[in-house]
Regions:
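A feature for the membrane-embedded catalytic helix bundles of lipid/isoprenoid biosynthetic enzymes
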Residues: 1-18, 87-208
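N-terminal membrane topogenic signal
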Residues: 9, 25-30
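Membrane-interface alpha-helices at helix entry/exit sites of multi-pass transporters
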Residues: 83-85
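Helix-loop junctions at the membrane-solvent interface of multi-pass transporters
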Residues: 25, 45-49, 167
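Membrane-embedded alpha-helical segments that form the functional core of polytopic membrane enzymes
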Residues: 30-81, 108, 113, 172-188
Length: 208
């Protein structure tokens, strides 16, 4: 699937919010902080089984997360701190939401695997940056082949979780228990795809 590689298509959905925030002169780091707060509130809403609130809080957390970088580019306020802060906020929200949803809807084992695999799927990129040395940037983002490798990343995780939240709210046969298991399994396969790509392209002794 890899929605990340189709960023220009996704931009149509979040750019209006980003442009509004740009016109309001909202600082990019404040937008990132807002995304973090909304994501944390979403995790708490899942904990208290307020599924509709959790759905919208998680949705807007994702939209603000997409908007912060766009606002930074539009306003010329891109900083390395902002990029790091955005990354930390992403992992905080993902870990908290997947952990709580996994624990209470699928059990502690699935929660552990879902959080661990999600973090590994992301952490493999900065490790690759450090070891392989990707440096080129486009619009503030590091250009690397892994951006297009792995069919199930953060956008797919969010979309799946939001979809199964609605299923759970509607009391359909497939709910959040099944959703978190699907996310975990697909993330594992996507991580394996990234590892195999790195092995194929950088596994030779001459490349070390």
């Amino acid at each position: 699937m890899n929605l990340t590689s189709k960023r220009e298509v996704l931009q149509k959905f979040y750019f209006p919010l980003a442009y509004l925030l740009f016109l309001l002169q909202a600082p990019p780091n404040v937008i990132t902080l807002t995304s973090l707060i909304l994501g944390t509130a979403s995790a708490l809403a899942y904990y208290y089984d307020h599924l509709l609130s959790a759905f919208f809080l998680f949705l807007f957390s994702g939209l603000f997360d997409l908007a912060d970088g766009e606002v930074a580019r539009l306003s010329g306020r891109q900083t390395k701190f902002g990029a790091v802060f955005d990354w930390i906020a992403d992992k905080w929200v993902d870990g908290l939401v997947l952990g709580i949803v996994g624990y209470f809807y699928a059990g502690p084992v699935w929660a552990t695997f879902s959080v661990t695999l999600s973090l590994l799927h992301s952490f493999i990129k900065p490790v690759a940056y450090a070891e392989i040395g990707y440096q080129n940037r486009l619009k503030g983002k590091i250009l690397d082949p892994l951006e297009g490798i792995g069919f199930f990343g953060r956008p797919e995780t969010h979309f799946t979780l939001l979809l199964f939240t609605l299923f759970e709210k509607a009391h359909l046969p497939l709910g959040l228990s099944e959703g978190i298991k699907i996310i975990t399994l697909l993330t594992a396969l996507s991580l394996l795809q990234r590892i195999l790509y790195l092995y194929k392209n950088y596994g030779k002794v001459d490349d070390e």
